[in-house]
Amino acid sequence: MKDVYENPLCSRYASEKMQHLFSPQWKFSTFRRLWLALAESEQELGLPITDEQLEEMRAHLDDIDFDRAAEYEHRLRHDVMAHIRTFGDACPKAAGIIHLGATSCYVDDNTDLLQMRAALKLLRGELLAVIDALSEFAAREADTPTLAWTHFQAAQPTTVGKRATLWLQDFLLDLERLEAELARLPISGCKGATGTAASFLALFRGDAEKVLALEKKIAEKMGVPNCIPVAGQTYTRKLDSFVMNVLSGIAQSAAKMATDMRLLAHLRELDEPFEAEQVGSSAMAYKRNPMRCERVCSLSRYVVNLAANTADTAMTQWLERTLDDSANRRLTLPEAFLACDAILTLCANVVRGCKVYPRVMEKHLREELPFLATENILMRAVSLGEDRQELHEAIRQYSVRTAEDIKLRGEDGHLLDMLLADERFHLTPEVLAELLDVRQFIGLAPEQTRVFLDTHVYPVLKSRRGDIAGSVPVRV
């Protein structure tokens, strides 16, 4: 029986790995690891904490009694105190030194930052998987000619591979920003109730050097290079905003690619993967909708808007802190990562499974090449001694007449027939075929594709080969 709300990010979209990172188990076992790191560091700096107490804490990092914690929270109305009590019940000898000198934000904020670091690493692997898939696609289709579209009107031809490099470049920029944020994202450390570390200064009897050493030890034990230099009760929420802007950038790139694919699906030049028994419409049995790309666009819009939410939170924190960030962040941060995880999983799936239809592209090229080739035809005739202005006007008139035949009367275009019949253009069928060779119109597209892959993509993938995420199935 399902009679309560389920978050579709968990029930339909996000991977189990990302869901685990934002699970209660991960969060509160990290609380306990932070309490252990604090106690170990305090002992190392001379506080009276016994090895027996530390061993007891180490033995109970993951066996969390969530029912007991819920009972405590119902009574105390404080989730951190509830888990302090629950951990203390599991570690009665250590109960008196758990959370010694700390405030709630010691575990809350540090866990959030550790969570974001872990989630960014997971997204990094998934982003690399998309880049890897796109690099294979671009290399395979480097020479496949296709119409380019500007203003969604036919323009000079390009190749399918060259178009894919535009998507690739966006994702590479996202990878660069993600890695930069990950490299500099600190933890909050242990700075006490208002960021002054007064409680720890008292514990260490005024020894400021030990207070500074405490933070360094905790950061090392948690595997993070540094702590944020200063804070109020909380770390600056600008860090959340910076991270969310990375996620927003990934969503923007994904939506751009998915939108392009949706347009190409309409033109019948490309299809996303479509399962053997997949149904496109409950009414129209013939439908083959690009639903995965549509989902990418839908989730991307959500992530981009969540990024604005974190900016609002960062700028509305009062003085050393207010709690109006709490409920908002509990929703915004996990859901942004879960959605971004789903987006990248879908993108890799679509790119690896999409089908390209060169024959359809050739048809579209044949329809447009007569118009695209007129400049070359004009230049050749002028080189043979004809008047440019006179022939330019002739081409304009023939083009208008052809467009009317196509649009008003539904006929095939007759532009080439009219140009062949006009002796001023000095054309023969053989010459015309040569002038219409699509290879004359794609410029450096194949070479640009290969150079971009060799110079900008393959080195990135080679140096990070072990970090590329494996395939994750799309559930629905």
Go through each PLM region and give its residues:
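Active/binding-pocket-proximal capping segment
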Residues: D271, A394-R401
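Alpha-helical transition-metal enzyme core signature, strongest for iron centers
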Residues: R77-V80, L127-L134, A164-L178, L247-M257, ...
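A short, charged helix-loop
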Residues: K216-Q233
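Short, well-ordered beta-strand elements within core beta-sheets of diverse protein domains
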Residues: K162, S241-G249, N376-L384
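A conserved active-site cap/scaffold subdomain adjacent to cofactor or substrate pockets
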Residues: T234-E269, Q278-A339
